[in-house]
């Protein structure tokens, strides 16, 4: 009976809400304690807020109030994830995730970070938090967002540090090099030297290098100070290659990380993939620059981005932010536009620590007692009852960082830039929101200490640029590509790469710049830790080719490039198979007619992708998955094209025989997976990403959180990435009213709202929505106005 009454109340409440927000031109006035003056919040047809205030305090207050009104439960879940407090709601199911976050200790880090913020930054965070709390104060048991009522709890007051800790989630999503260090050690131990050396060679003929140059690919140099020498150094220090149990523990820990980040939309595959590019006016149809950006993160409902237009005497800015974070993270102001993609440098190091029987850890100064802190996690005993019981864990912290792996008598500690309380990204975005030119753009980024990013730039005067920003460590010895011996000083961080030494471009002769997580600097760059871990070059190369051919770029042609699904490596492989007659007549005919695009109805795309995976596994001699993955991503394309004898597996006379074997195995695998009817063997069956709410699978109640079931297609090697384009921006400096900005679903986190998924159709089809900016365009778009008054 209780659930029936609750359901009826919800239906009535949401029906009333729908009527209120649908009245065209409605004006509403609300008294809110904490404001210094009146604030105007206007909304357009997509409920995108346009907020104007007489001072920055009230602007951030109103932004917090507005975002909380649309995404309060999402905000609460993000801070709970980063603080390790989800088991209080979900019980044992997420306890391991909470333990991981508690070991990382970000709650303590952000508390310490506040002392390093300038007064205006602290005021912005405090004003935003006050606005969130003012909205929370308006809620009662009937008006709480539905997720709170289902889970039977109420939101705690928002704190300024809650906004800061969301930045730590992003850092976690964009940094996983510690596990790569272990995998590299495994690769070197398990592969013949010639194979490992070729895998360790970072160069690829499809690379899009923006800074510096490469030694010619035809003459591979001997590695200097990289994996081989570092491994020899490690062994001389008594560090053995990570054993299978250590690697298994690392994989489990990374799986916990993936589950945790995916639940709130922050997990990203393929080294946190994203695309951005900028085109100068000399290559555009109207003579003005165009900037594009589409970050790739996990599909979730609601999406991780929230659109905001903010205006005060110090700025006018529009774009997206994370719910819970003041200001705009990616977007534009009156003068400049900016976008970002992940760089992927090595900002994490593992240290094999030596402990004695007394629990002390070995250091260069002798045996020392590590810091040990106790963390208490409240764990819900029953999903239908909010009562909890405490679970305590002890976290050991050495001088290098917290111990995150303890297996087989070995303990590994993690050092990470995100653990430094001085490293925050909020100050940089605060500056970007107000920057007027290239120099002010660089000044803002010079203080950026978050996950390293490729920031692209365009301004209303026609200038374009690119600058890497982030804290990238310098080591006393080696480059951090393998675990260090924690008892020595070899892994000591001696500083960070200076901002003016980070790769950058300003108005390059080419007239455009593209980054897609590729290796952006040549092998002549002095800091190898910046260019060692990166995504494959395929997306960057495809975008480079499209932009090179587009002499008169438009918003429409840029949008088409964002939606492009041509797959370079699979197209190359299909041609090689056809040329060698390396498959059955049916397969050869199918591949010969393929256009190289990962269309959802493509049979060829599905089959050749399956064949590629088979080839990689056989080249790795069907051994552990790590070598197979490295082979597929690093050298398979070249090995097949050049018929490299080094990579031809034993038992095969030549590559044609290898291709035929993989064709047979792939067809058999697809028959088992999809049935004998080949008409249903289409790429859309394998690649579709779907948006889902964290509660969508809950019995009885999950259906109300359903999102569109349409598949979202692409692949990891195409500009239109399958998993997952989290938003699309096309900014047009000098003509801001033609800027396009679209998120996957909608502004509201309320599944009953008309704005829960009203942007999906535009997002799915690539027809991005115009985002008005001028006062005249905004005025014409407004359908509802709310005035907040003190």
Predicted feature descriptions by range:
Residues 479, 586-674:
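A terminal-accessory region detector
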Residues 529-584, 662-790:
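Terminal end segments
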Residues 2-12:
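Bacterial N-terminal signal peptides that target proteins for export
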Residues 96, 107-108, 129-130, 427-453, ...:
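Proteins synthesized as precursors that undergo proteolytic processing into mature forms
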Residues 410, 447-550, 612-617:
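Hydrophobic alpha-helical segments
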Residues 271, 312-322, 331-335, 340-487:
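Glycine- and hydrophobic-rich flexible loops that cap the catalytic core of alpha/beta enzyme folds
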Residues 11-22:
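Bacterial N-terminal signal peptides
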Residues 27-290, 295, 301, 398:
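Substrate-recognition/specificity elements adjacent to catalytic centers across diverse enzyme folds
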């Amino acid at each position: 009976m209780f659930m029936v009454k609750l359901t009826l109340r919800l239906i009535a409440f949401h029906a009333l809400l729908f009527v209120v927000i649908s009245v065209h031109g409605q004006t509403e006035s609300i008294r809110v304690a904490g404001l210094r003056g009146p604030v105007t919040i206007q909304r357009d047809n997509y409920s995108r807020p346009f907020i104007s205030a007489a001072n920055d305090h009230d602007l951030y207050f109103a932004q917090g109030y507005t975002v909380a009104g649309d995404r309060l439960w999402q905000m609460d879940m993000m801070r709970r994830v980063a603080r390790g407090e989800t088991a209080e709601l979900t019980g044992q199911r997420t306890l391991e995730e909470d333990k991981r976050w508690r070991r990382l200790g970000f709650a303590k880090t952000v508390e310490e970070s506040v002392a390093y913020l300038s007064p205006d930054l602290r005021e912005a965070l405090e004003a935003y938090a006050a606005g969130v709390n003012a909205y929370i104060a308006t809620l009662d048991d009937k008006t709480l967002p539905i997720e709170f009522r289902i889970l039977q709890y109420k939101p705690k007051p928002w704190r300024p540090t809650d906004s800061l800790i969301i930045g730590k989630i992003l850092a976690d999503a964009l940094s996983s090099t510690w596990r790569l260090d272990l995998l590299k050690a495994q690769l070197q131990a398990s592969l013949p030297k010639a194979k490992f050396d070729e895998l360790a060679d970072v160069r690829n003929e499809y690379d899009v290098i923006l800074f510096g140059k490469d030694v010619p690919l035809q003459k591979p140099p001997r590695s200097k100070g990289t994996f081989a020498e570092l491994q020899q150094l490690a062994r001389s220090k008594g560090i053995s290659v990570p054993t299978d149990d250590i690697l298994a523990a690392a994989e489990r820990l990374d799986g916990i990380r993936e589950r945790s980040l995916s639940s709130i939309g922050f997990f990203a595959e393929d080294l946190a993939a994203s695309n951005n590019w900028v085109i100068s006016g000399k290559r555009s149809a109207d003579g003005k620059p165009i900037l594009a950006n589409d970050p790739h993160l996990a599909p979730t409902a609601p999406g991780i981005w929230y659109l905001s237009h903010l205006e005060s005497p110090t700025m006018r800015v529009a774009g997206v932010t994370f719910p819970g974070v003041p200001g705009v993270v990616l977007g534009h102001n009156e003068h400049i536009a900016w976008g970002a993609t992940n760089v992927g440098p090595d900002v994490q190091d593992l240290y094999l620590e030596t402990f004695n029987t007394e629990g002390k850890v070995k250091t260069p100064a002798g045996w020392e007692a590590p810091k040990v802190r106790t963390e208490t996690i409240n764990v819900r005993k029953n999903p239908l009852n909010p009562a909890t019981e405490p679970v305590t864990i002890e976290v050991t912290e050495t001088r290098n960082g917290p111990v995150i792996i303890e297996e087989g008598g070995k303990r590994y500690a993690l050092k990470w830039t995100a653990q430094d309380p001085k490293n925050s990204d909020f100050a940089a975005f605060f500056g970007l929101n107000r920057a007027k030119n290239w120099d002010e753009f660089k000044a803002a980024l010079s203080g950026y200490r978050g996950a390293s990013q490729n920031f692209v730039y365009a301004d209303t005067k026609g200038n374009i640029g690119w600058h890497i920003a982030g804290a990238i460590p310098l080591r006393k010895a080696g480059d951090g590509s393998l675990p260090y011996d924690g008892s020595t000083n070899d892994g000591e961080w001696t500083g960070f790469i200076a901002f003016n030494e980070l790769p950058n471009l300003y108005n390059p002769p080419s007239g455009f710049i593209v980054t897609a997580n590729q290796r952006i600097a040549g092998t002549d760059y002095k800091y190898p830790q910046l260019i060692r871990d990166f995504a494959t070059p395929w997306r960057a190369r495809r975008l480079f080719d499209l932009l090179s051919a587009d002499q008169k770029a438009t918003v429409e042609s840029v949008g088409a490039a964002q939606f492009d699904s041509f797959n370079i490596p699979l197209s190359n492989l299909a041609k090689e198979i056809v040329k060698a007659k390396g498959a059955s007549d049916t397969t050869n005919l199918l591949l010969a007619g393929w256009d190289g695009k990962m269309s959802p109805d493509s049979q060829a795309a599905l089959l050749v992708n399956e064949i590629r995976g088979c080839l990689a596994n056989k080249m790795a001699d069907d051994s552990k998955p790590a070598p197979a993955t490295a082979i597929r991503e690093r050298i398979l394309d070249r090995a097949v094209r050049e018929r490299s004898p080094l990579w031809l597996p034993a038992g095969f006379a030549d590559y044609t025989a290898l291709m035929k074997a993989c064709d047979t195995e792939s067809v058999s695998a697809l028959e088992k997976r999809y049935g004998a009817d080949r008409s249903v063997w289409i790429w859309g069956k394998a690649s579709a990403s779907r948006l889902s709410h964290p509660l969508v699978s809950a019995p009885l109640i999950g259906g109300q959180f359903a999102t569109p079931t349409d598949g979202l297609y692409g692949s990891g090697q195409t500009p239109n990435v399958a998993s997952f384009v989290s938003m699309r921006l096309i900014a047009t400096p000098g003509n801001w009213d033609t800027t396009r900005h679209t998120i996957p679903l909608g502004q509201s986190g309320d599944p009953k709202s008309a704005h829960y998924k009203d942007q999906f159709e535009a997002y799915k089809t690539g027809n991005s929505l115009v985002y008005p900016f001028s006062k005249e365009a905004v005025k014409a778009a407004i359908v509802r106005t709310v005035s907040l008054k003190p």
